[in-house]
Amino acid sequence: MAAMTVQLDIVSAESRIYSGLVAHLQVTGSEGDLGVMPGHAPLLTHIKPGMARIVKQDGSEEVFYLSGGILEVQPFSVSVLADVVLRADEIDEQAAVEAKRRAETALADAGADFNYAAAAIELAQAIAQLRVVETIKKNIAR
């Protein structure tokens, strides 16, 4: 008996990052973590900056960083559209740490003309990238 799978396409503003059959997708939706498996009900939702974890047809896993975007689930296909998509090994950990530090400093020293939304987005994206890096480190240590 063949494993149940669904076609997944992960697309950034620049290119298609992943296209293939998967058994499971996990992303951070606007209302919390969301798991998508074959047969999932149709859905269209926003996704927050965070990790996308896929379990491929052969059981192997791959992890991506998404800057946020849109998730569309159809009966036989799933599409993830994001401005920025990085494979876990493409994330610059030091740059993410520095971006997190900058955003935290900006939030702490906010003035009257401060753009809170931009700083909060930068902080969320940096934290999400660091979580992806940490997840990969934990999986390698196993």
Swiss-Prot record:
The UniProt record lists the keyword Membrane: yes
Main subcellular location: membrane
Role noted for this protein: Produces ATP from ADP in the presence of a proton gradient across the membrane.
Keywords, in A-Z order: ATP synthesis, Cell inner membrane, Cell membrane, CF(1), Hydrogen ion transport, Ion transport, Membrane, Transport
Localisation: Cell inner membrane
GO MF entries: ATP binding; proton-transporting ATP synthase activity, rotational mechanism
Membrane-crossing residue ranges in chain numbering: none
Subunit details: F-type ATPases have 2 components, CF(1) - the catalytic core - and CF(0) - the membrane proton channel. CF(1) has five subunits: alpha(3), beta(3), gamma(1), delta(1), epsilon(1). CF(0) has three main subunits: a, b and c.
InterPro entries listed in its UniProt record: ATP_F1_dsu/esu_C_sf, ATP_synth_F1_dsu/esu, ATP_synth_F1_dsu/esu_N, ATP_synth_F1_esu_C, ATPsynth_dsu/esu_N
Protein family according to the UniProt entry: Belongs to the ATPase epsilon chain family.
GO cellular component, as recorded: plasma membrane; proton-transporting ATP synthase complex
Protein's name in the database: ATP synthase epsilon chain
Membrane-protein topology: Peripheral membrane protein
